[in-house]
Amino acid sequence: MAQIIDENAKVCETLEGYLDSIGITTAGLNYHTLSIIGPQSSGKSTLLNNLFHTTFETMNDQIGRQQTTKGIHAAFNNQNVLIFDIEGSDSRERGDADALFERKAALFGLALSEVVMVNMWEKDIGRYNASSIPLLRTVFEVNLQLFSSSQEAKCHLLFVIRDSTHPGEIIENQVRRDLDMIWKDVILPQNLQGKKFDDFFVFHFFQLPHLKLEPEKFKEQAAKLASMFTNKDEPGFFFAQPMGKLIPGDGLAQYIHSVWDAISENRELNLPSQRKTLSNFRCEEFANQAYKEFETNATEQIVSKIDAKPFTEFKEIGQKLFETAIHNYNQQANKYVRDIANEKRQSLQERISSFLAPSFQRNCTIFKESAEKKFTEYIEKLPTELEESNEWEQNANKKLEETIKSIDEFVKSTMIPEFKWQFDVSDIEDNLHTLITNKLDTAISEMEQRVFERRNIEYKERINAILDSAEPNMWERLRSEMRNEITQTTSEINNILKKNTVDRHPSPKIANMYYRSTDSQITSASQFIQQKMIIRFEEKFLQDEEHKSRVWKPDDDISAIFESARENGLHILNMFTNSQLREPGTPVPLNDILTRQILTQIRREQILTEFNDTIEKSYISAVQIRESLIVRNTVPLWMWIVIAIGGYQQLVSVVEHPWKTLFLLAAIGLVYWLWSNQKLDKVIKVVKNYITRVLCIIVKLLQSTTQEMEVAPSILQASKKSAANDMELIKKGLDDKKIEDEKTLETADTLDTMTTEVSESNSTSASTNSPSKSEDSKEPAPAPKPRHRKRVSTSNNPYATLQPNRINQAELLKMKEMIQKRQAEKH
């Protein structure tokens, strides 16, 4: 037994020690409370000692009636019942202050007790003070103050009727009549109007005989009453239903302090608030204690273990430490207000989560970096030559999925279920996908370059062939070739991409690569446009339709052929002026290489001038050859008459002699044989050549000297002028004019020879007509002095058979006009 509230209304300092000594602090909620009120010297302490075998101080009969219990005392029996013995009311010692302390004591008893015993003598029922009517009035008012708004169980009021001799029903009715009278005088709040006192209290009545007059009966009834507090199987067991007033034993001392402080300061006593305050304080202490223990263990067993390698036992150890901390907290906090305990438990869980979260993130990051490193090594080992591989991107994506899955599984295996942690793997997924994309882009780019370079070798050869031929449809052929090559290259690349990628297509730069390649070949070919023009001119001018060397005939229109060949050469120049690689009808962007200017106007004029200068020589040579043929084939009619008259005797001789006829028939047979074997033309050509030479010699001897003298200077002058031009071209060092220069030189030599022969012929004619010489002289003329000239090959020289003769004056004038016209165009 110990005093907890002294007579000065102060909480005793020994309260905590006493509660700890009787085991309340470790009892949790496994105890019950009751208090007793009543008038002073009414035997309250004696009753408690008899009921619960306590040792409360009782009144000494030898000293007389006086105040025995001062303040509030407490005792604890073996049945875990904490009993409060409250100072009696209506005491002489307190006098007028009795009402104030009486109210405070009533508040305390109702606040802490599950059952409030009212000690009442039967003989005092019906009296005002003796029957504790003022005290009961205080109990009613205090109860309304404390519990009117709460949903706690009703307060149990046990009226113990001492020294009872009347039937219980009569006593109960009398007490209830007094209670009803008291309740009518209590001012009820607005929300409690119409309520009865039975709505707030559970009334119990128990009668005890006189202690001294009937001690055996008293002990018997006292034991029965005591069993109703201690025996759970006893009918009418007072603590059968929890009343919500119990405070966990470890917080009882603090609760008593807070309640009594509020009572002493006359503050409104809000028991639910007091319990919440106590619960908040105690649960906070429990949470701090559990967290401190957890922090120590987690630092040693988890935080220190996470280093360069993933800690695979994170979840197992973390879960165990977390559950231990929560279990330790629950063991102590669950005895307090549930909402407060749950709130503090949640707070503790959040603190534990916050402590472990950095370690969780770090552990997952270490695993993520390890997985990322392995994935990078895998990607680096993939082949870069897509031509030799299959399903490149599919394999990379599969590896990516496996990597992300392994990270997710590790995160799940590490995460504690109670904690809503998040580990973002989207960044690594983006990074690894970017790595795949970059690696694949590089591999595709290199593959496209390899395919292009391989195909471009043959492509350039085909393009060069088209550019070299320079046909009129050159640009159409170039566009077609470029379009087909782009299509084929794109198709080949697309087949490779289908094997190695999911949804990749050839790059648009493939077309640009072929654009640049084609344009480069065109640029290179444009450096030789003049040569192409000359070759095209010579193909049309120096070759016939069968692409054989042209043999000029007297009736050939050289001017028309020349102009046609020249137009063919100029067509090449026109084709190479601007690029026409872009498809007709398509939009033309700025700075388009497919439609760019290839030749500037200055370069074009330069090429045109040099081209005209070069082809003029071919024209002059052709005209000279034609004129020589006219001279060869022009035999006068009178010459044929002379031959017929001179050969008459030979014809008669052939007729008169049969063997000559046979020879003639043999000759005819030979001719037929040659004709049937397609050799006649060749023989005729050879024979005709020899006959022509013979006839030319005869004609040369018979032509007029005057005409020959007029023609010779003109031929000589033209030959010298041509030779001078040839020498000028030779001095310029133009290699591409070498063949033409040789032809011109041969022409000059031929013309010079013709001039010399004409002069010799004139000399012979003059000597024949000279009067100093006899026409019948048989002495042969002296042979002319041989000329030391360069021998000209006749195999490829069309002028080798040219013989000196008279050239038509009109043709020479036409040649002169054409030369002057070319010179005017040049300037």
From Swiss-Prot:
Compartment(s) where it occurs, according to its Swiss-Prot or TrEMBL record: Endoplasmic reticulum membrane
The GB1/RHD3-type G domain, residue ranges: 28-242
UniProt biased composition (Low complexity): 753-772
Alphabetized UniProt keyword annotations: Coiled coil, Endoplasmic reticulum, GTP-binding, Hydrolase, Membrane, Nucleotide-binding, Transmembrane, Transmembrane helix
Bilayer-spanning residue ranges: 635-655, 659-679
Class of enzymatic activity (EC top level): hydrolase
Cytoplasmic side: 1-634, 680-827
Any one of the GO CC terms: endoplasmic reticulum
Annotated Basic and acidic residues bias: 813-827
One Pfam family in the UniProt entry: Sey1_3HB
Coiled coil: 322-346, 384-407, 475-501, 805-826
Annotated spans, Disordered: 745-827
A biological-process GO annotation: endoplasmic reticulum membrane fusion
PANTHER family, per database record: PROTEIN SEY1 (PTHR45923:SF2)
Family the UniProt entry places it in: Belongs to the TRAFAC class dynamin-like GTPase superfamily. GB1/RHD3 GTPase family. RHD3 subfamily.
Described purpose of this protein according to its UniProt entry: Probable GTP-binding protein that may be involved in cell development.
UniProt name for this protein: Protein SEY1 homolog 3
Lineage of the organism: Eukaryota, Metamonada, Parabasalia, Trichomonadida, Trichomonadidae
